[in-house]
Amino acid sequence: TFIKEYASYLLRQGLNIGILENDFGAVNVDMMLLQELQGEKCELEMISGGCDKETHRRRFKTKLISMAMCGYDRVIVEPSGIYDVDEFFDGLREEPLDRWYEIGSVITIVDAGLEENLSDQAEYLLGSEAADAGVIVLSRLDKDNACEEQENRIISHVNRSLERIGCTRRIEKEVIAKDWDMLTEEDFAQIQNSSYQIESFRRPEGTEKDGFQTLYFMNLNRTEEELVPAVKKLFGKRGCTDDSEKENNKNLNDIGRVFRVKGFMKNQSGDWMELNATTQKMTVNPIKEGQEILIVIGEDLKEDKVRECLEDECTEGAENE
């Protein structure tokens, strides 16, 4: 969503841009969300995951080499939320990319509803992705609460993560905490010119292991009206009104820890809808084109339990927000 806003700003400046979508999983849903940007001055490219680390690095380099021939003024590299930042910096230091590209700005998006207690792997990712950022932009701000309070809480959390990984940097004023609909041309200019920092930090033992998972569910044949309550169940948001209801929901603990769900489905009228959900918020918006896929991202996920939850016909007790 942020890339749509930022890329639109760059296009208003008359720039010719390329967007490289870099997804952690094997299917890139975000490409479909950006398709309306594609045109004479904006082209979309994609790298899908689902491969080993070295293959992914090679694909990243190869794609940037081909994009260098296109005469772009700016290339936006969109990593997945689960990303090894060393891949970006190391790749751009290699021949011939070091002669063809110059790093402009490193922009880190942090969820304003970020949970206070994260796993060690998640804390490392938060710290490593914030360490070199020129600017941190908060997403999913709660419009009913003071943005300053949310901003201070996130800054404190990011700084704790930086300390945990042995990074001496501390975030202070490098944060933009505004509803994205309220971002001005001056805000986008600040983001565009925010540059980046090079910081050192420690990679804790075990972070090389794949603690995060991405599960793909194709052709569930369920409508928006059926999937929205099912997705809320994944986050444990069913309304438990009595002991029997709580007993029915106890197996939700076996699902694993779900961070995000995104994808597409049709509503009862047959129109495509885009779903984007976190532990804090769910949005469902119309989209011109889609495909029947739902992606679940989290830690220690049990695929059979997740599928059972999504395909469960029993949706009573779930309330739409």
Show where each model-derived region lies.
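Short glycine-centered, acidic/aromatic-flanked micro-motifs in structured strand/loop junctions
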Residues: 79, 140, 298
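A generic structural signal for short beta-strands and their flanking turns/coil linkers
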Residues: 15, 25, 213, 259-261, ...
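Nucleotide-state-sensitive switch-loop elements of NTP-binding domains
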Residues: 1-119
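A generic alpha-helix structural signal
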Residues: 7, 64, 89, 228-231, ...
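Short aromatic/hydrophobic contact patches that present stacked aromatics
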Residues: 76, 214-216, 295
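Conserved C-terminal guanine-recognition region of P-loop GTPase G domains, centered on the G4
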Residues: 67, 82-170
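C-terminal edge-of-domain segments
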Residues: 290-300, 306
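C-terminal accessory "lid"/substrate-recognition subdomains
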Residues: 128, 132-138, 143-288, 301-303, ...
